[in-house]
């Protein structure tokens, strides 16, 4: 990860004659202070909880009830999903979509219905052919000019295009076509359609974080004249109930973090535990994954500390015994590493030992071994980067990529995310994940290449660090912008791979695959305008505020 260099002040707790001139990343302190240390009072009373259950049953009945046509059914299911409450109705929605998949006359559908049907079915793994859009093209192979006046249809085609896989040229064309015409139309549209279009052009449904998108759509949906009052009320209550649960979890994590006292002991490291929780709540937000969220947040917090130790403070000579200690994973190794490394090493081992204790009741200790091995591989990759920096070595782009992909940490996070899941995860799941399957490769490429572009474009990297963009520019003799374009094409290709892996039959259950999808979504949200984790950009601030601070008025 990136850092900007300054000298370690002589007053630092880590300062000595040996390391007064150490490079240190000039990271901002946490912008949240102790805001999340204490959990707020419960914002839902017993009467509201009872109302929540009543509304839940009402919505369930509406999902399965016959409607006038498939367009109404699709639109209602879409609203349920976009409002963030579809996790309550997984089976009902799946049954309805399966029925729509097998019983539908595509020839009669307009652009809106064709597009929303395509998107929803693709989201649920149905391999709907993109040929359904051919009827909206003219004899010259261009989209008909008549569709440009159908703004809602264009908006749905735009959203559907983000579910494309390799070889679907018509959807590649649709992205450009709809983006152009929606951009022209947005200023003349009335609210709330204008807000829907404006937001979509910034963030597609497919690549947005479900909770962030739900929070935004709640404010839009209530202004749609035809909105369903029961669904809206249910979604608002459900949002606040989840927010309270998430605040409780974050409060517990913040107390753990404060007790570690890394702000004083390790002043070179980023204090981003709140942003880390936001990241992981993007991986899975549902109540049943509370344990997984807390464990994975602690892991990403420790991975961030380990990363900063390698990247922003330690000498290569210190990193060799530190890496050896991580490889051996034994508290006895603590005597072999420098004094300042001991707190982070002990905390790292403690986090994984706590994981063992938490999953032992269900005989799932084996899962933690896979998680440990993934962390060890991450540390080993960090050491390679540190060696390159020491030697001022400029690897070829392919050599750099082979090591840089593991250093983004996404394979480690994907594997570790499975530890806190239920019976849907088996030993075969971990064997599959450890084999570097295509979907984990895809999310890793999205992470690595978006990070590389953000670091270089926004100058978030130390001058002595090896840069993927610089490697590519030097090897191929291209400008920075040309390199960005190549990297962005790799990201788009990886998204197509990721979409392909969701089409039935899948290698693993959708709930397993969703972890990689959501990890990719976090990158799209946080890193499109720079490193939004390290430098806490607008997306992170806005997301944390709307999801964890501000409840919805009922």
Curated annotation (Swiss-Prot):
It catalyses: (2E,6E)-farnesyl diphosphate = (1S,8aR)-delta-cadinene + diphosphate. A motif (DDXXD motif) lies at residues 307-311. Signal peptide: none annotated. Its EC number is 4.2.3.13. The keyword Metal-binding applies. One of its GO terms (molecular function) is (+)-delta-cadinene synthase activity. It is an enzyme of class 4 (lyase). The Asp-Asp-Xaa-Xaa-Asp/Glu (DDXXD/E) motif is important for the catalytic activity, presumably through binding to Mg(2+). Responsible for the cyclization of trans,trans-farnesyl diphosphate (FPP) to (+)-delta cadinene. Belongs to the terpene synthase family. This is (+)-delta-cadinene synthase isozyme XC1. It comes from Gossypium arboreum (Tree cotton).
